[in-house]
Each structure stands twice: as C-alpha cells, then as structure tokens.
Amino acid sequence: MTTPLTFDNIRRAPKALLHDHLDGGLRPSTVLELAEQYGYEDLPAHDADGLATFFRTAAHSGSLVRYLEPFAHTVGVMQNPDALHRVARECVEDLAADNVVYAEVRFAPELHIDGGLSLDAVVDAVLAGFADGEKAAAADGRAITVRCLVTAMRHAARSREIAELAIRFRDKGVVGFDIAGAEAGYPPSRHLDAFEYMRSNNARFTIHAGEAFGLPSIHEAIAFCGADRLGHGVRIVDDIEIDADGNAKLGRLASLLRDKRIPFEMCPSSNVQTGAVASIAEHPFDRLARLRFRVTVNTDNRLMSDTSMSMEMLRLVEAFGYGWSDLERFTINAMKSAFIAFDERLAIIDEVIKPRYAVLVG
C-alpha cells in the first residue's frame, strides 16, 4: 500500500541536497547565543522568534541584492573557530533530522576572516564541525554524509585564491568550488582564472547563474567557464518556447544543457523570495522536470526561507501534484550529480535511497 504524501511522511524519505549555504541555515537561538558570547551587538531582534521573523521578512524582498543583506548578521557571529565548528555541527544535525542522507554545504571562507583567522583555519573549523555532526547523527541512527563546497564572492577578487583553497582541502572533505553573490555586473567570466585552475586540477565546480540575471549568465557559466552544475538556473526558461498547443521548442542553449545532463540546483522558496519567480506554482521546476532536464530540489538558505528539504518537496507536491516516484527521481538526480566518486554515489542510491523509497511506495 502506497504511503500518503503528507509532510510527516515526506520527512521520512531519504534526501540528497546539493545547494545549501552554511551561513543561511543557522538556528535563530544559535545566532543569539553566539552574538552574546562573542560580543556581536548589531542583531535586529533579541529573542529567537523575533530573529526568525526578521530573517524571513527581510529575505522576502523580491530582490537578490536585498535578500543577501541579512547575511551580515549570521556572518557576523561566525568569526572564530568555535562558532564555525558549532554552526557546521548543528547544520549536519538539522539536515540529518530531516532525513537528508547526503549533502553538499557551501560557504565563503573569505567572509569569516574578520576576526583574524586564516582561510585554512576557517575551513579546518567547518570541516571538523561537519565530522562531529556526522558522528552525532550516526549515533542517533540517522547516517548522513556531508561534504563541503568553498565559495568565492563574485564581487571580490579572491576567486583564484579560494579555488586554490578548494584544491588544498580536496582530500579532507572539500569536493568542489562555487562563486556566489549578486549576479548583475559580476559575470562568471570575470573569474575564468579560478575555473581554469579547477579544471587543470581535475576538480569540480558549480556556478550561481540564471538566478537574478538572464541567459547570458548561464551561457557564460557553461560555454566559457565549464561549470559542472548550475546554481538555480531558472532563467533557462527564456530559451524555451511553448506554442499554442503546449509543445515546447528548446533553443540551442537549453538543448545543450538537457543533452549534456547539466544539473540544475533549484531552490523554489528562495526563488520566490528573491523575485526570480512570482510563486511556487509559476516556478519553472515542473516545466523543466517534464522536459527531462536534470532538476534537483534544494533549500538554499534554510533560515532565511524558513524551510527544509521536506518543506521544499511538500510545496512542489502541492503545486504540481507529484508522487513518490517523482520525489525519488529528483533525489536520484541530485545523488547522480554529487561531486563525490561514482562508487560512493551509486552506493547511496542503491543501498539507501531506492530501498527506503520502495517502502514508501509500497
């Protein structure tokens, strides 16, 4: 008998997460405690509920630039090793509680050196937190594998340095590289040196593209930079025409991405908040899924969007009528697209995801 598609049952399903920002997923209570512990005095609220409301309201701005402003407060309390370790450990624990079995969590080390830490010390603290979180989750009966992506800020000039950091830590838990931040005025091609360095070292990377900016951003990310995945990529719909009969005609860029099986790290709730789409119901996720693009479900920033993987899946189920087989496909899409070794990906798919979905499907 098929299990009903309720929120509680979706929470039971195994999940794979590719696009989650460490500084966008703190517990409100942790932000408060770290601010008090380390003397951060600029918080806009001084109780957990008020702080959660602030982050959610501020992020729901209709603009990517304004959406990013509240991160000053989370980054502000993440400037020493103990804070970074705690945030990383709690991130893993929270994901495991939502039955995420594999996650790639990203963060920008350059944003965490105001307290005097080196870039290497920042990454060391985060990776140690991830490892401790994995151990705690396993002890609780919720095994999870978490790997790290290091991100360079696209408005800064440190992308090559951060790419080198990714390579230094590639055997210690860092599996890839990314650029993030406001897209307008900061095209991916500005960071070609970093991407060429990653490619020359046989390393993987994703690029935030096609979120707040259009097709040129996606084209550069793929054609010039050689991205393995796309962060968001919602504007690819601008290269897909739908005729009066509902038939889709793909442009050359959209065709290339589908043919090459380029994964889309789609973050529905976040895209509504930033104004990339008007609503979940109008999100291009479903159109792309039906056209067999490799779409994946992601959280982006769990604190700012007041969300989880289970909540993102539920919203898609409610908007588009998906069933368990659809959620399983999106999960396997993500696992196939992870930046870990093929045999590790296959083991999680065959030994964890498929058996647990078989129980839910009945």
Swiss-Prot record:
One of the record's GO molecular function terms: 2'-deoxyadenosine deaminase activity
Cellular component, GO, one term: cytosol
Residues that hold Zn(2+) according to the record: H19, H21, H208, D300
SUPFAM superfamilies: Metallo-dependent hydrolases
Binding positions (substrate): H21, D23, G181
Record InterPro entries: A_deaminase, A_deaminase_dom, Ado/ade_deaminase, Metal_Hydrolase
Catalysed reactions, as listed in the record: adenosine + H2O + H(+) = inosine + NH4(+); 2'-deoxyadenosine + H2O + H(+) = 2'-deoxyinosine + NH4(+)
Cofactors required: Zn(2+)
Residue numbers annotated as active site: E211
Cofactor, free-text remark: Binds 1 zinc ion per subunit.
EC number: 3.5.4.4
Primary role: Catalyzes the hydrolytic deamination of adenosine and 2-deoxyadenosine.
Entry's family note: Belongs to the metallo-dependent hydrolases superfamily. Adenosine and AMP deaminases family. Adenosine deaminase subfamily.
Classification via HAMAP family: A_deaminase
Protein name: Adenosine deaminase
Lineage of source species: Bacteria, Bacillati, Actinomycetota, Actinomycetes, Mycobacteriales
